[in-house]
Amino acid sequence: MAGQVVQYGRHRKRRNYARISEVLELPNLIEIQTKSYEWFLREGLIEMFRDISPIEDFTGNLSLEFVDYRLGEPKYDLEESKNRDATYAAPLRVKVRLIIKETGEVKEQEVFMGDFPLMTDTGTFVINGAERVIVSQLVRSPSVYFNEKIDKNGRENYDATIIPNRGAWLEYETDAKDVVYVRIDRTRKLPLTVLLRALGFSSDQEIVDLLGDNEYLRNTLEKDGTENTEQALLEIYERLRPGEPPTVENAKSLLYSRFFDPKRYDLASVGRYKTNKKLHLKHRLFNQKLAEPIVNTETGEIVVEEGTVLDRRKIDEIMDVLESNANSEVFELHGSVIDEPVEIQSIKVYVPNDDEGRTTTVIGNAFPDSEVKCITPADIIASMSYFFNLLSGIGYTDDIDHLGNRRLRSVGELLQNQFRIGLSRMERVVRERMSIQDTESITPQQLINIRPVIASIKEFFGSSQLSQFMDQANPLAELTHKRRLSALGPGGLTRERAQMEVRDVHYSHYGRMCPIETPEGPNIGLINSLSSYARVNEFGFIETPYRKVDLDTHAITDQIDYLTADEEDSYVVAQANSKLDENGRFMDDEVVCRFRGNNTVMAKEKMDYMDVSPKQVVSAATACIPFLENDDSNRALMGANMQRQAVPLMNPEAPFVGTGMEHVAARDSGAAITAKHRGRVEHVESNEILVRRLVEENGVEHEGELDRYPLAKFKRSNSGTCYNQRPIVAVGDVVEYNEILADGPSMELGEMALGRNVVVGFMTWDGYNYEDAVIMSERLVKDDVYTSIHIEEYESEVRDTKLGPEEITRDIPNVSESALKNLDDRGIVYIGAEVKDGDILVGKVTPKGVTELTAEERLLHAIFGEKAREVRDTLLRVPHGAGGIVLDVKVFNREEGDDTLSPGVNQLVRVYIVQKRKIHVGDKMCGRHGNKGVISKIVPEEDMPYLPDGRPIDIMLNPLGVPSRMNIGQVLELHLGMAAKNLGIHVASPVFDGANDDDVWSTIEEAGMARDGKTVLYDGRTGEPFDNRISVGVMYMLKLAHMVDDKLHARSTGPYSLVTQQPLGGKAQFGGQRFGEMEVWALEAYGAAYTLQEILTYKSDDTVGRVKTYEAIVKGENISRPSVPESFRVLMKELQSLGLDVKVMDEQDNEIEMTDVDDDDVVERKVDLQQNDAPETQKEVTD
């Protein structure tokens, strides 16, 4: 027997076919959300308040500082927030200190800064009662970027950009005459040397001494019209502020505010880290020949001689000297924007491949401290040096799509950015109020207006592109949504502009972003999913774990390092399936490995790292596809995406053939209930589990406090499915931390269970499975195998109108008693009532407009008071196709203190209707390999083909769906599933390390089946065997959310569009089917004139004809001729609005008055014409 038995959770054992042992546990799959939010509360908020403090008034007398903050207790708990449509949030209170410098007085006060939304334990937010997820955003990292571009003459040119987190961009570029230009914040270009002069390098000689002599610099100096620092400052000021009179002081302050003011310019810690890394001498000197010795500035000793070529080992040796500023120079700048001296490191090297022995200077930024978040003059000089080095062939250009240059903004950072916007708006208000208020009586509370802060937070959660309504179709959808990475959103890309390169799979995605799971359609490649083992580091770069190889023994160690994409570029990484001996050494001399995106074979001594697991490449959803390695990637993509659309079934069942990922995905999704502490189960019932904590002190275990876990019962999920939790532990069980206590929807015994295991045959049957259609046995309908529960919510608001308040009542005008049979005394449907389409759920009446009353009515009104006022019914009825059983009714009253109701609403009634949907013809089904189809026929059980032992199969699939699609994984799953069913076991076949062909065939033989997995099938209708043996097995099939009940729709009479009077379209509007231009051609081709006429008139926009037709049908008369369609009148009005005089003439050239014609007049005129047997009026348009 291949494989070993592995325990998944408390209740499930699986035979696992993996050959590679797991060296690292999967991390908590939603920590990308929870960790980021924790960081925000712990550090992000304080950082924000520090950035903005102190706020000073224009005179500098008043100073306002934010000292500390605390979060209070939420007003409503989580469940209550959902029920009341409230936001789950806690009050944020900030300690504020006001210092009056004249008197030295200090006033401290705690100020309320609004309610701050809290994250739930499962990584979501409850906003206005709905669960939402904040998707992480993939953006370009702030840094220095160098690009290569080919100009129109085919010459290689370079450009460079310094991109901050916020602030002005700085760009360098060359032109056809080899002059180097700079652009400040996307304005017109200036010669590069102008900026250098403005920084304090006044003369040409100083600039040449600094950067080294080369022709590009000489050309640029020739082009440069300025001669000293002052002229350069004025030149820059004129470019940035054209039309304003330039002065040196203004120019200095402008340049300072653009680049060196921390409030205006921010590289962020990630930008500083990337800039230092890029401009550091280590990478730039690699493989270069020194033209001068490297000297230790502190001791004066020569570390490396002139003429040495620096390889990787040599650089590593002198790393400490480079870090301690070898060959550093300090420049005192006079008349510059910044008065501080500038320190740089410069080393001369020989230009590569140059016979004349020319040299160029490599300048480093001398490693500014990580606290320096602004750009420094040293950064600008070093980046210019890098640019000139590139022109000499030293250095590398950047790949923008490399994950070393793209980073994640997770919840915490997105919130922080939004909060910063709110605070900066508030800062303006505070400054204004400081100058108005009296300093004697002023308090921090009076200065602070919290509106802008609350508004920006509300806007972010309510309407940001990255704050999304959680996809709650099933636990996998929930989990994937929390791990989603989007390149769209504010500050990101747009669908229309995103190029092919951005969307493509990049080698740096390995182990960081899933290459499979991404939507089909316009968002392909822009929305991705985090790989299973990946995590996000402090700078927002995605890291993936690798096993370290000992450099001396070349054996795999237990040490696991997390590497970012640019760190990985320096190492050679072996595949996870490389063969190892018992000491952890590579068995083969040549090992398959990766280096910078090349898959090659290298000697085992060259290995630096090894993959942790074969599934580290793919995301959680993709890792749930068994035999993924046998599927084509396009189909695997569909398989991963369709699992997220599976509807939770009434009786879920975990797959016989899984991957071992089902348990982890279910546990971390947030749909299951997991133990927060180790403990013993004391009480279990359907809606609550009580666990007594077991605490260990000094080696002795004793009982602690009692934890209460409420279970959600038959709640409506975000996608209208049934959200129900079932306990799977018993009283007395000892549970560990994070163990599953209760299954959520689509879960069975602690494992994800999106579908059911059914017996499938690959065969055709009377052509019913043409084009991927699915033929199904009636047993699956009768036994509720694919029955799902759906809950829909309907609400009715009782408002105040101009004519008086609406009210809920049983007393409704013109409604029979039988129609009110389901309503209680209040006029609201009772719980448990079975309602059909069109039944009344809430009896509500609205006052009608009072028309001019006659004398008699006024008398009655005077005698009986209000009673004579008319009301019209505005009932809440069951929409089409939404009938079911009333599950719950909630009533919110303003009088009873429900402050969550919106203004003008006195009462709100919510009715929940539950439907049990059995599977139908027209429902969409799929497997896990992208094999999808629509049910075309449900065959009686007795007519289904049956196995030799008499068991009928459940589903027939078309064999033609397999070869062209190349998803062979489904065939292997089919055979292994049948063997597992016969053996009574569950199996796990992890991705890229699962059962191979031999394992599958040996398991089939072990189960006593034929080795080819085929069997004789008998036709259920005739009892004859089919001609050939057929592949029959067990496949895991899912029912998808695309159900025919939601799509099929028919209209008799319904609403019409206001202007054109044509029927509306779409199921939601109860619309009609559009009879379009091509359909009209078809009827014209047949010469079906009368059919065409009625389609274009009565059945469309002939308002008068519609009424007359209805009348004629009711009275049993002949249908009269049509009148003028409304669209013709609209056309006339359109032409008249263009200033054209349009008239309608009859055959005798008499004008037909169309403008003020009343509908009734038209009808009368038509009727007259018809009675006189006059020829039909002809319409012609004249100018």
Curated annotation (Swiss-Prot):
Cysteine-cysteine disulfides: none
Cellular component terms (Gene Ontology): DNA-directed RNA polymerase complex
Coiled coil stretches, renumbered: none
UniProt cross-references to InterPro entries, sorted A to Z: DNA-dir_RNA_pol_bsu_external_1, DNA-dir_RNA_pol_su2, DNA-dir_RNAP_su2_dom, DNA-dir_RNAP_su2_hyb_sf, RNA_pol_bsu_bac, RNA_pol_bsu_CS, RNA_pol_bsu_protrusion, RNA_pol_Rpb2_2
UniProt entry keywords in alphabetical sequence: DNA-directed RNA polymerase, Nucleotidyltransferase, Transcription, Transferase
Highest taxon of the lineage: Bacteria
Catalytic activity: RNA(n) + a ribonucleoside 5'-triphosphate = RNA(n+1) + diphosphate
Entry EC number(s): 2.7.7.6
Molecular function via GO: DNA binding; DNA-directed RNA polymerase activity; ribonucleoside binding
Protein's GO biological process: DNA-templated transcription
Family note: Belongs to the RNA polymerase beta chain family.
Role: DNA-dependent RNA polymerase catalyzes the transcription of DNA into RNA using the four ribonucleoside triphosphates as substrates.
Self-association state and partner proteins as the record states: The RNAP catalytic core consists of 2 alpha, 1 beta, 1 beta' and 1 omega subunit. When a sigma factor is associated with the core the holoenzyme is formed, which can initiate transcription.
Protein name per its UniProtKB record: DNA-directed RNA polymerase subunit beta
Species per Swiss-Prot/TrEMBL record: Staphylococcus aureus (strain COL)
Gene from which this protein is expressed: rpoB
